[in-house]
Structures are given as C-alpha cells and as structure tokens.
From Swiss-Prot:
Protein name from the UniProt record: UPF0303 protein PSEEN3311
InterPro entries in UniProt: PduO/GlcC-like (IPR005624), PduO/GlcC-like_sf (IPR038084), YBR137W-like (IPR010371)
Family affiliation: Belongs to the UPF0303 family.
Naturally occurring in which organism (per UniProt): Pseudomonas entomophila (strain L48)
Amino acid sequence: MALAEDLALLVRQEEVLQFKHFDEDVAWQLGALLQRRAEAEGWLVVIDIRRFERPLFLAARPGVTPHNHDWIRRKCNTVQRFLCSSYRIGHQLAIDQKDLTQRYNLSPVDYASAGGGFPITVQGAGVIGSVAVSGLPERQDHQAIIDALCTLLGHDRAALSLAPVGKFANAKGKVVAVSG
C-alpha cells in the first residue's frame, strides 16, 4: 500500500475508533486486551493508556528496557500535540519528505513520528488522551492498538487493518513489497 493510501486508512481509523465514553474502567479493559495479547504472543512491549493529565494504565513485559518507556513518552507527546496518531504524523512527514524538526521545529528527543501512539477520542468531546505500545516494529505497534480498539468497540478489524509489511500477492496475483 502506498503512503497516501496508508494515510487515508490511518485517518479513517481515527474517525471510526471513537468511544461513547472513556473512564478508568474502559482504560483497564483496553489495557487488559493489549496485555493479554502481548503475553500470548510473547511480545516484549510497554503499554501506556492515559488521559493527557494523568496515566490510567501501564504495563511492561519482562525484557523491556528504559528505551521502550522513552518511546512511549515521545509517542504520547506526539498524539497530544497533534491530536492524531503518531503513525499518521510519520506518514504525513514521509509524503512531504520532511521530519519533525524541519516541519514543526520539534525535537526528536521529545516527539516521535513512529507508529504506536493513537488518540483516545470521545464522541462529542474530542481527543482526551492516548494509548501507546512500544517494543515491536512501528507498524505492528500501531496495528496492535487498532486490533484491540476494534475488539473493544465492536468494529471489523479487517476493514481497518493496514496491509502487513513485506511481500504479498495483490488482488491481481502480482507480488509487491509493502513498506512500513
């Protein structure tokens, strides 16, 4: 999938994956979904769910490092700054052939334009927080969040999933490469 097509789907994910309400119990349910999958898959990840003013859920699998926690901080900062997914920002920047510093004068020490940070949006209220995963390749970090949100909110995962990175056969049977 080309960057522009990916970007359109990233925008669609944000439009569809919204909550009617969001509180500590919902944060716990979302975090538990992500934690159970991480455990089942053997993922070495950090999971962070927060309202912008405070953390609501934090889990770290054995083997993660402070580096993963720093990625979480930077991804959450990006979501809070732009009110959209960190992966969407990365795609917009890639299309424009810019980075965070060139486009927004933001330091990569504090912001990340990598997949794995997603806005928590409440219908009628807007973006109130973020969910972030760090420890997998960025596209997988992002997709883990999308899968959990689809499960929790009752949406079709296939309709909102990015194509996997790597080589695959397209609808015409031609093998194509997908970058993340």
